[in-house]
């Protein structure tokens, strides 16, 4: 029993450290190929753009480009070519022309569709029941108090474009969970990149 108590305390300590340092996970909800038109590859030069105003935008784009490179796919982070210019109000003709001018035949657009925060209650370990001194009443030993963790949830839509056709040829949706705030997002960029590049890889478009 004592070994079990020590194991529970150790497990709780690990959980507490994970929450303090930031936990980040991304999952693919669904994917679809041939959304507007079918892929007409081969595609030789992809531009990756995170269409959200955030100081980690460049960090995320770079992480995705690095993952594509590991798969043998030539990709470029949009911020290194187009800076911080958004696409709000720009026509498909204009965007396609700009991308073709810079040698891109495909584009991955990352849209943040929803962001919300939830507070999660983590129950402390009650331990084993022990008798109250001088009585026959049993009560649990409490090794740790309950505590609360703030979790940020991000719902993302991914659009893969064929520039020449001006059409979405693949689309995916992901949900990410983050408890580490800014640091959690920074640490989670690599995992997010791995998840979405693997999903695109399974579509066998490149």
Regions found by a protein language model. Name each.
Residues 1-19:
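Sec-dependent bacterial lipoprotein signal peptides
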Residues 2, 32-35, 93-95:
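A generic local structural motif
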Residues 13, 40, 101-104:
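Alpha-helix termination/capping residues and helix-transition junctions
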Residues 19-43, 138-206:
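C-terminal/domain-edge helix-coil "capping" segments
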Residues 40, 67, 131-133:
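Hydrophobic alpha-helical membrane segments
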Residues 46-55, 80-86, 144-147, 178-185:
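Second-shell loop/turn segments in exported
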Residues 49-120:
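N-terminal segment of the mature soluble domain
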Residues 89-160:
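Surface-exposed short loop/turn segments
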């Amino acid at each position: 029993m004592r070994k079990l108590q020590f194991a529970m305390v150790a497990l709780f300590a690990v959980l507490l450290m994970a929450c303090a340092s930031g936990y980040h996970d991304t999952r693919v909800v669904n994917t679809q190929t041939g959304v507007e038109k079918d892929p007409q590859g081969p595609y030789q030069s992809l531009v990756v753009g995170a269409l959200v105003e955030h100081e980690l935008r460049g960090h995320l784009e770079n992480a995705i480009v690095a993952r594509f490179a590991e798969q043998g796919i030539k990709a470029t982070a949009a911020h290194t070519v187009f800076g911080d210019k958004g696409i709000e109000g720009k026509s498909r003709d204009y965007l396609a022309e700009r991308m073709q001018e810079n040698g891109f035949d495909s584009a991955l657009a990352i849209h943040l569709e929803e962001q919300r925060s939830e507070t999660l209650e983590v129950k402390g370990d009650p331990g084993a029941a022990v008798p109250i001194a001088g009585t026959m009443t049993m009560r649990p030993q409490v090794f740790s108090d309950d505590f609360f963790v703030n979790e940020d949830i991000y719902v993302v839509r991914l659009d893969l474009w064929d520039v020449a056709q001006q059409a979405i040829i693949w689309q995916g949706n992901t949900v990410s969970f983050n408890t580490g705030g800014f640091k959690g997002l920074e640490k989670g960029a690599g995992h997010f990149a791995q998840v979405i590049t693997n999903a695109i890889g399974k579509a066998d478009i490149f």
